[in-house]
Structures are given as structure tokens and as C-alpha cells.
């Protein structure tokens, strides 16, 4: 069992995944990251011209690294903290449930 | 029914595996290093998901042709709204223009709104023209000049009245105030 597998399975199971995802989406929309990435996509599409040869996969490989760096540090820190608290929260809940 | 036992079996298996997942997760969380790893992994995955969402949105817009529609047609620069100080939205100065016209008869500056009545009087048209009246009076009753001046609006006062036809209200006011000051001064001297 790898870390990624375990985390994926557990977060999906407990429903934390959608919770964290909602939070992330809200924060990113609030700080304007969404619009920035959208603009980036558009400019790249315009650069590549009108040819239909450009696929979504190509776009993803090109823009994903840039999109990651575009996230403001404050938002990134906050999200990491939130994810950590949510994950550890569950652990304590499990312990609480098992104790009695 | 052959399906029920298998369904029950799979259900049992599910509960077993979910318990297993929880246990695995708990083991993982206990180690702070792997917790960090897990947190970072979660963040990266969800961020990538968000990015992918935007990509697909953009791709969909492009394929349906809405992307170019969102860009719209480039605006003509002549119709662009101007945002300079002291200019209106068309880029024209908001300062008041002098709307004076030069009277072709007497070469005096007259406000545009008053030009027509001025011209009428100046050229001696119409019944109430003071110039015509004064001319008539002057030719017919040249001896009764004193009466004319006492009449007020006729004769020599005509030109002085024409100064008021120009648009400069400041001049008017200043002249009035100077008159007032003068009268006050005079009053002061007399008292």
C-alpha cells in the first residue's frame, strides 16, 4: 500500500475529499487563481493557432506546472494546514470512537 | 436466488477492506513524515484536479466556438470611452467654449443666444428697434433732445446697453460691484 493509494481511498471513504476539494476551489476562485489560469489557457490556445491538432493533454502538460506556481503562498499554506487538520481530526475521531 | 450470497459476500468484503483502509490510514498518520507526504499529496492531487477542470472548461468553450465569442469583436478606437481628466467620455474638453458671434454690423462680440435679437435691433429692423425710434425722433424733433434722454432706453444709452449683450457675465458683475464699492466709498467720504 503506497501513501497515495491509502490517502486516496481513505479520503474518498470518509467524504473528506469532497470537503477539501470544495474548500480548495473556493479559495482559488476567491484569490483569482482560476481567472489567471483561464487566461493562461486562452493565451496558449491563441498562440498555438486555430489548428485542431492541439489536444487537452498537451495543454495540461504545458500549463499545469505554471498553474502550480501561480497559487499564492498564503492560500497554499492555508490549504496545507486545513488538509492536515482535517486528516488528523479524523484520526482523533477514530480513536475516540474506539476508546469506549 | 444465486445472487444473494455473492452480494452478501462482496458486502462483507467491502466492510473488511474499508476497515483495512482505515487501519492503514491510521498507521500512516502516526508518522509525521508520512503525514506531511500525505498532506502534500492531497494538495497536489486536488490542485491538479482543479487545473484539469479549467482545461476541460476551456477546451469545451473552444470546441463549441464560445471562446472566440467571449473574446468578442475588437472595439473601434473612435468609440472607446475616454477616461482622461477634464474630458468627457468622447474625449472632448468639458471646458465651456466661448459661444460668441461677431455682429457684422457693429463688429461687437455678442452671445450666440442673443445674437438674433441684437442683430434685429442693431440693423434697425422691427417695430421696437430703439435705433429707428431714436433716428425718427432725432430727425423730426431735433429740438427735444432733453426729452429723449429723460425717456431712458432711447438715444445715447443704446450703445451702453449693447455691452450687456455679450456673454461675459463676470464683467457685468465686476462692474456692478465696482459701482457699489464706489457708492460705498462715496458714502464713506460724505459721512
Curated annotation (Swiss-Prot), chain A:
Main location: nucleus
GO terms under cellular component: cytoplasm; DUBm complex; nuclear periphery; nuclear pore; nucleoplasm; SAGA complex; transcription export complex 2
UniProt entry tagged with the keyword Transferase: no
InterPro entries: TF_ENY2, TF_EnY2_sf
Protein family: Belongs to the ENY2 family.
Subunit structure: Component of the nuclear pore complex (NPC)-associated AMEX complex (anchoring and mRNA export complex), composed of at least e(y)2 and xmas-2. Component of the SAGA transcription coactivator-HAT complexes, at least composed of Ada2b, e(y)2, Pcaf/Gcn5, Taf10 and Nipped-A/Trrap. Within the SAGA complex, e(y)2, Sgf11, and not/nonstop form an additional subcomplex of SAGA called the DUB module (deubiquitination module). Component of the THO complex, composed of at least e(y)2, HPR1, THO2, THOC5, THOC6 and THOC7. Interacts with e(y)1. Interacts with su(Hw) (via zinc fingers).
HAMAP family recorded: ENY2_Sus1
Protein name from the UniProt record: Enhancer of yellow 2 transcription factor
UniProtKB/Swiss-Prot annotation, chain B:
Record-level Gene Ontology MF annotations: transcription coactivator activity; zinc ion binding
Localization, UniProt: Nucleus, Nucleoplasm; Cytoplasm
Zinc finger (SGF11-type) stretch: 101-122
Gene3D superfamilies, A to Z: Classic Zinc Finger (3.30.160.60)
Residue list for modification Phosphoserine: 167
GO cellular component: cytoplasm; DUBm complex; nuclear pore; nucleoplasm; SAGA complex
Primary location recorded for the protein, binned into one broad class: nucleus
Residues in the signal sequence: none
Gene Ontology terms describing biological process: chromatin organization; mRNA export from nucleus; positive regulation of DNA-templated transcription; protein transport; regulation of transcription by RNA polymerase II
InterPro entries (UniProt xref): SAGA_su_Sgf11, SGF11
Entry keyword set: Activator, Chromatin regulator, Cytoplasm, Metal-binding, mRNA transport, Nucleus, Phosphoprotein, Protein transport, Transcription, Transcription regulation, Translocation, Transport, Zinc, Zinc-finger
Sequence segments annotated as region (Disordered): 146-191
Sequence ranges of Low complexity compositional bias: 175-191
Subunit structure: Component of some SAGA transcription coactivator-HAT complexes, at least composed of Ada2b, not/nonstop, Pcaf/Gcn5, Sgf11 and Spt3. Within the SAGA complex, Sgf11, e(y)2, and not/nonstop form an additional subcomplex of SAGA called the DUB module (deubiquitination module). Interacts directly with not/nonstop. Interacts with the AMEX complex component xmas-2. Interacts with Cbp80; important for promoter recruitment of Sgf11 that is not associated with the DUB module.
Family listed: Belongs to the SGF11 family.
Domain writeup: The long N-terminal helix forms part of the 'assembly lobe' of the SAGA deubiquitination module. The C-terminal SGF11-type zinc-finger domain together with the C-terminal catalytic domain of not/nonstop forms the 'catalytic lobe' of the SAGA deubiquitination module.
Main function: Component of the transcription regulatory histone acetylation (HAT) complex SAGA, a multiprotein complex that activates transcription by remodeling chromatin and mediating histone acetylation and deubiquitination. Within the SAGA complex, participates in a subcomplex that specifically deubiquitinates histone H2B. The SAGA complex is recruited to specific gene promoters by activators, where it is required for transcription. Required for nuclear receptor-mediated transactivation. Binds independently on SAGA to promoters in an RNA-dependent manner.
Name by which UniProt lists this protein: SAGA-associated factor 11 homolog
Organism taxonomic ancestry: Eukaryota, Metazoa, Ecdysozoa, Arthropoda, Hexapoda
Name of encoding gene: Sgf11
